[in-house]
Structure formats: structure tokens, C-alpha cells
Amino acid sequence: MSNKVRIALDAMGGDFGASVVVPGAAISLTRHPDSEFLLFGDSALIKKELEAHPALKAVSQVIHTDVAVSMHDKPSQALRRGRKVSSMWLALEAVKNGKADVAVSAGNTGALMAMARFCLRMLPGIDRPAIAAIWPTVRGDSIVLDLGASIGGDEHHLKALAVMGAATASVLFDLERPTVGLLNIGVEEIKGGEEIRAAADLIRAMAQPPFDFIGFVEADGIGKGAADVIVTEGFSGNIALKAAEGTARQIGEYLRAAMSSTLMSKIGYLFARGAFRALREKMDPNKSNGGVFLGLNGVVVKSHGGTNADGFAYAVDVGYDMVRNDLLTKINQSLHRNGAEAHGVAPAA
């Protein structure tokens, strides 16, 4: 690996494009000065933003394209229109060709997933990717996957997610043996559908898993920090994510209304504002920004499309950590070490 971490950025992705991507990269660079950047997009817009960030400009290369994937494009449309020419595709292609170590985009999730699968292909034995993200809990942070990369999945898919999720938690949280749980409607072994019960059996039967399996976890256990890694298929994972985000916003609105409803409540807020500030920082979605696409033959990080520069910087940080800690190699080794088990294929005789 090069001494520098080379980061390819889709500078036209997301709701705000280069106006967020460039300052976000500049913030990340202050934390990781051994980074270099390839910025793909409208060169005039990118260079204008770079003028305010000379340190970033000095370690960046701008590659022009005026084709950007819309947040409203369907994946099939994005592939037809943006393949080979869009800022999103070119960032991914830089990873494929070895010019970058990781691609980061705040663009259309479905389009990014489709392009990543087409451009980078899947790891051997993995038939579909997953989105893994950091989830703040009362005990720290957890990794939750899949958060919507694909719908459904049999027991072998869930087992592969457990292996990849554990490798990700080991890298991000510096854990030797992370705990892993399967999201279910109850913790009892008889609960849930056939696939999830079969997945639990397959995981328990693994000879030398790189994690400690704790069984089933209910939805309220995610926020409680019941496990370092929570595994679920993409439909349930995406619903859980959106429900949690909505609940956080609802609580925030309730608190704001309560603290401004009367003179006494306003006075009380003055005494408690330090605690409320700490709570707001803990629940700040920007600090959990950066979903990792797992299962691909390359490292790809997805930022929230509507994030600000601070949030995008956290997504870049995630990509940096993935590369510096060699996540792709560790996932491959973990899948191989657990043999065809992790892929749901019978070992050779």
C-alpha cells in the first residue's frame, strides 16, 4: 500500500455537490494529512471551491466531467447515461484501475450501488452487496447491516453479512472479537422466519468464527447496544434506520417545544443547556455519516445526500479508516478462513 491514502470523490454527488464535498474533504485532510484526493466533476466549480482551501488544493487532482447522476435517476437510467462519463462512475473506476484506494459519494444510493456492482464486481462467493453504517447507542457505537442495499436474503446471505460486519467492526472499533446478533422479532430461538432461524444455526455451527454470536436481538436492542454488530436483511434494516432517524427528529422537536413553551422552561434551559448540547452532539447524524458498501471488490463509502461539510468529512474519514486498516483484505481473509461456510457452499472434500 502507498504511504498516502488516495481518495476518489464524486464532487457532483448529493444535494450540494462541490460546495459540500470540497470543504468536507478539507476538514478530513486536517485529521488525516497523509491523504490525497481525486475530485471528479465540473472543474470550474471544483477549482473555485479549492481556492478557499490551499492545503487541500496542494494534494488534489481535478478530473473534469460535466455529467452528474441526478438524485432522481433510476439505477438503470444512471447506468445508461452515466457509465464511463459521470463523476460517480469515474470515481469508482479510479478504484478499479488502482488510481484510488476508496471512492466516496453523496449521490443517488441506488445508482451508486448499481454502478459499483457493475464497475468493481463482487467479492468471490458474495452474490449481493450490503450497506453497513455506524449506529450510535447508549453503550457506544454499533455496526448495523444491511441498511437497504438489497431486499430479502437467505440464511447464507445473512451468515456472510455477519462475517463482513464483524470484520468492519474490528477495523472501525479496534475489537478483537466483536459480538454479533441477528435482528429478529424476539430473542427466543423459536421466533422469526425460517431463513433467520436457519442463519442462526449456520452461524452457531461455524468452526472458528471471528466474532462472538449472541443470538437474536430485538429492534430496541439496537439502540441499547446489545451487540457490536447487528445483522438483518436490507428491507428490515432500512425500515429500522428510517424509524430511528424519525424518532430522533421527533424527540428533538419535542424538546425544543418544551424548552420554549413558558418563561420557566426557558430559564430551566439556560441551566441545562450544557447537557442538551451534549445530547445534541451525541445524536448528531453527521457523526454517523458514511455507509460502507460491503461485498464489493473495492472500498466504497456512501454519504448522506443532504449532509453538510462536517458530515461529508466524517464519510471521508470512514473511507480513510477502511483503507488504512486494510478492510478489504481482512474481509477476504475472514471469508476464506471460515471457508466456503461463509459463502454458504459446502467445503471441498
UniProtKB/Swiss-Prot annotation:
<dbReference type="GO" id="GO:0008654">
    <property type="term" value="P:phospholipid biosynthetic process"/>
</dbReference>
<keyword id="KW-0808">Transferase</keyword>
<keyword id="KW-1208">Phospholipid metabolism</keyword>
<dbReference type="InterPro" id="IPR003664">
    <property type="entry name" value="FA_synthesis"/>
</dbReference>
<keyword id="KW-0594">Phospholipid biosynthesis</keyword>
<keyword id="KW-0963">Cytoplasm</keyword>
<protein>
    <recommendedName>
        <fullName>Phosphate acyltransferase</fullName>
        <ecNumber>2.3.1.274</ecNumber>
    </recommendedName>
</protein>
<dbReference type="Pfam" id="PF02504">
    <property type="entry name" value="FA_synthesis"/>
</dbReference>
<comment type="function">
    <text>Catalyzes the reversible formation of acyl-phosphate (acyl-PO(4)) from acyl-[acyl-carrier-protein] (acyl-ACP). This enzyme utilizes acyl-ACP as fatty acyl donor, but not acyl-CoA.</text>
</comment>
<keyword id="KW-0444">Lipid biosynthesis</keyword>
<comment type="similarity">
    <text>Belongs to the PlsX family.</text>
</comment>
<dbReference type="GO" id="GO:0005737">
    <property type="term" value="C:cytoplasm"/>
</dbReference>
<comment type="subunit">
    <text>Homodimer. Probably interacts with PlsY.</text>
</comment>
<dbReference type="GO" id="GO:0006633">
    <property type="term" value="P:fatty acid biosynthetic process"/>
</dbReference>
<keyword id="KW-0443">Lipid metabolism</keyword>
<dbReference type="InterPro" id="IPR012281">
    <property type="entry name" value="Phospholipid_synth_PlsX-like"/>
</dbReference>
<dbReference type="GO" id="GO:0043811">
    <property type="term" value="F:phosphate:acyl-[acyl carrier protein] acyltransferase activity"/>
</dbReference>
<comment type="pathway">
    <text>Lipid metabolism; phospholipid metabolism.</text>
</comment>
